[in-house]
Amino acid sequence: LPELYELENDIEREQFLRAYALTYLKEEIWGEQFVRNLDPFRSFLSVAAQMNGKLINFTGIGRDVGVDTKTVQSYYQILTDTLVGTLIEPHHRSIRKRQRQAPKFYFFDTGIQRALSDTLDQPVKPTSYQYGNVFEHFIVNEVVKLNAYQRHPFSLSYMRTEDDVEIDLLLERGGKVLWALEIKSTDQVQAKHVRHLKQLGKDLGAHRLICISRDNSVKQIDGVLCHHWRTGLDLIFSDKHGKLDPGLELHEVVDLK
């Protein structure tokens, strides 16, 4: 959210993010009468924020919130329709099998997700598991944003095998996987970080394999391109509409305490 950069301190930023979330509830959802009963939807937002970037268990969320599975599905549809986030579907060449697997949902802004999950007061340390989640969330949002500017946008999906091996993002056009993307928050990419990407990407017939991270060095490990996240995204979205905002820094997103 651009408004955050104009605020002077973290307290003001936290207050803004919480107020934004409440305004969304009042004006976008209740005001437009997307839902008749706001209480379960409010509970759903909290759970959805906690589940950000994870496989969606519609039945489990419904049980926690007190609504049925179809209602949870309609809630997620409301979020996508109001541009509050993006559903990333699982990859499978069979549409029928794809529909049997669970999608992931990413809120459009890491700060809003943290406000809704009530974690704004928890510091995000670079070595923590939470930092890895926030970094992945940040990169996915950048990919979604840059992809929207493309004349011929990619179809975005993720891949997860039965033994829980995963590729974070697949970028497809014309039924072909042009990029298989692994997101790592490390500042020192090693062979262990790209092992699964190498194998699964090869099985998929992906044209290019890339790992983007906080590592400033450009290298190639076992056929996998390894780039800093900024240059990596510039490489993927290399046309004139795909340039990153030069003023954008990750610390501006996650260092809100």
Regions found by a protein language model. Name each.
Residues 185-227:
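Catalytic cores of nucleic-acid endonucleases
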Residues 106, 157, 179-181, 210-212, ...:
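Hydrophobic/aromatic beta-strand patches that form the interior of the parallel beta-sheet core
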Residues 82, 134-138, 200-208, 254-257:
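Short secondary-structure transition/capping segments
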Residues 172, 177-188:
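Active-site ExK catalytic segment of metal-dependent nucleases
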Residues 117-119, 182, 192-193, 222, ...:
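Short conserved micro-motifs at the rims of enzyme active sites and ligand-binding pockets
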Residues 109, 160, 184, 213-215, ...:
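Residues at the C-termini of beta-strands that transition into short coil/loop
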Residues 215-257:
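Domain-level recognition of nuclease-like catalytic cores that cleave nucleotide substrates
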Residues 3-177:
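Accessory nucleic acid-recognition modules appended to NTPase machines
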